[in-house]
């Protein structure tokens, strides 16, 4: 089973448990760390995630995963809030966090200054969506507005502003 297949299976198992309690699955990671494997769930809920909420989800999901057994190898389950630098994984996230500073990594190089020097990583203020494209006001280009097709985004997360 590929890692993507494992992640998809975990998402399909976990989503109903979270949605039943009004919680959101922000992201899922399954990776080798140190001597073993970690299955990490990032969750959110209105008003923020508490330690009690993480513990409750860990218990409920832990029992579910014991029964369903979607992963062949031994692993540790961790449940966490997404943090201040939360990943942006859904199209709605870019609308929800409009006005916030974000770092966006594109799958393809984009030439923003017309000099033929494309780049893939951009930091700017999220300005919402336009026809399925993420609108970003670049911090290093005096607010230059650019659009990146959602499907071209490899990774994105909120940035902590100081």
UniProtKB/Swiss-Prot annotation:
Q: Please list which residues make up the signal peptide.
A: none
Q: Which domain of life is it from?
A: Bacteria
Q: Which CDD domains match?
A: YlxS_C (cd01734)
**InterPro entries to which the protein is assigned, alphabetical:** Ribosome_maturation_RimP, RimP_C, RimP_C_sf, RimP_N, RimP_N_sf
Localization: Cytoplasm
Gene Ontology biological-process entries: ribosomal small subunit assembly; translation
Q: Name one GO cellular component term.
A: cytosol
What Pfam family is a match for this entry?
DUF150_C
Q: List the disulfide bonds.
A: none
Per its UniProt record, what Gene3D superfamilies does this chain match?
Answer: Ribosome maturation factor RimP, C-terminal domain, RimP-like superfamily, N-terminal
Asked if the keyword Ribonucleoprotein belongs to this entry, the reply reads no
What are the entry keywords? Cytoplasm, Ribosome biogenesis
The text of the family note is: Belongs to the RimP family.
- What function does this protein fulfil? Required for maturation of 30S ribosomal subunits.
In its UniProt entry, what is this protein called? Ribosome maturation factor RimP
Species name: Syntrophotalea carbinolica (strain DSM 2380 / NBRC 103641 / GraBd1)
Q: Which gene encodes it?
A: rimP
């Amino acid at each position: 089973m590929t890692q993507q297949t494992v992640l998809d299976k975990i998402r399909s198992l976990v989503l109903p448990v979270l949605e039943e309690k009004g919680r959101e699955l922000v992201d899922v990671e399954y990776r080798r760390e140190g001597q073993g494997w970690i299955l990490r769930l990032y969750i959110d809920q209105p008003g923020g995630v508490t330690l009690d909420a993480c513990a409750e989800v860990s218990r409920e999901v832990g029992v579910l995963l014991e029964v369903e057994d979607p992963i062949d190898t031994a692993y540790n389950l961790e449940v966490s809030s997404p943090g201040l630098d939360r990943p942006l994984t859904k199209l709605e996230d870019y609308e929800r966090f409009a006005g916030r500073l974000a770092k966006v990594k594109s799958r393809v190089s984009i030439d923003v200054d017309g000099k033929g020097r494309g780049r893939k990583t951009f930091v700017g203020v999220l300005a919402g969506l336009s026809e399925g494209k993420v609108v970003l006001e670049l911090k290093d280009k005096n607010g230059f507005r650019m659009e990146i097709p959602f499907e071209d985004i490899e990774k994105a997360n909120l940035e902590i502003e100081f």
